[in-house]
């Protein structure tokens, strides 16, 4: 909550209750509530985490929601401690306060509930060594790693990658203190167009009808293991993932011994479930 910094507002409580009800069909299903998000969705974290009293109330509110909905855990998606993303409040003490907040949440919800966090590809902003005993696993947002005419989520480095790619993101988190078996690789169900000089997000399900992509030709980057659409000069104009590239990433996650994979996000997949089915098949084969 952006006014008192301790209450937790669920965007669509009716829909979330429907999701929680899925546990009746599959009792082994794990459902977590993710709190935060990009930009103003993370407003209030810094103000709350710097105050011991507010940390405790926030943690108790997390516990209350777990009990109310009968779900399995909390995911903290603070984007990002110490960073003024989209103008949100931040302080250099956020990293230390983040750990204190997570300790308070763990104390409130107990050891039998899941506590996870979302982290950018750079592995900055967190003290992972201090968080290791508190957090069950880290969801690496190994996407949004592109500038103009670059891959959004390359598995490996190529001439079309920016400063980060999936393999590097995993390595940085491992070097920062988190073991591979507690790392989850993020998979994007969307891409970015560089047509017209502006980076524009386009969902996988909308690719065929998107006018910006007309006249572009699909190519495969054999080094980065991702597809892209290029103009007549071979210049990357649209970066995205498809079933093939997600298959390579799932194979990498299994061979590397990662905790697993996660996707962002369900709504961006097509009606046939092309991407989520590809991920499921690759992870279960």
Residue ranges and their predicted role:
Residues 33, 76, 105, 138, ...:
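Conserved, mostly hydrophobic/aromatic
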């Amino acid at each position: 909550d952006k006014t008192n910094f301790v209450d937790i507002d669920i965007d669509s409580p009716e829909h979330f209750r429907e999701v929680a009800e899925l546990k009746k069909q599959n009792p082994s299903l794990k459902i977590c509530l993710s709190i935060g998000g990009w930009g103003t969705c993370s407003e209030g974290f810094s103000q709350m985490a710097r105050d011991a009293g507010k940390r405790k109330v926030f943690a108790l509110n997390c516990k209350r929601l777990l009990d109310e909905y009968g779900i399995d855990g909390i995911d903290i998606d603070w984007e990002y401690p110490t960073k003024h993303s989209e103008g949100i409040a931040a302080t250099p003490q956020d990293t230390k306060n983040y750990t204190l907040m997570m300790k308070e949440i763990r104390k409130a919800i107990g050891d039998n509930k899941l506590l996870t966090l979302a982290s950018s590809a750079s592995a900055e902003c967190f003290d992972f060594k201090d968080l290791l005993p508190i957090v069950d696993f880290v969801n690496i947002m190994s996407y949004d790693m592109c500038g103009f005419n670059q891959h959004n989520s390359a598995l490996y480095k190529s001439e079309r990658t920016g400063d980060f790619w999936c393999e590097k993101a995993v390595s940085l988190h491992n070097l920062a203190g988190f073991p591979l078996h507690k790392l989850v690789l993020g998979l994007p169900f969307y891409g970015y167009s560089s047509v017209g000089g502006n980076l524009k997000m386009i969902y996988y399900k909308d690719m065929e009808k998107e006018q910006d992509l007309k006249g572009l030709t699909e190519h495969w980057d054999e080094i980065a293991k991702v597809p892209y659409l290029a103009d007549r000069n071979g210049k990357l104009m649209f970066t995205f993932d498809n079933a093939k590239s997600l298959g390579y990433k799932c194979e990498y996650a299994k061979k590397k011994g990662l905790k697993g994979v996660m996707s962002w996000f369900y709504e961006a997949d097509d009606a046939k479930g092309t991407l989520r089915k590809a991920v499921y098949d690759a992870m279960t084969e």
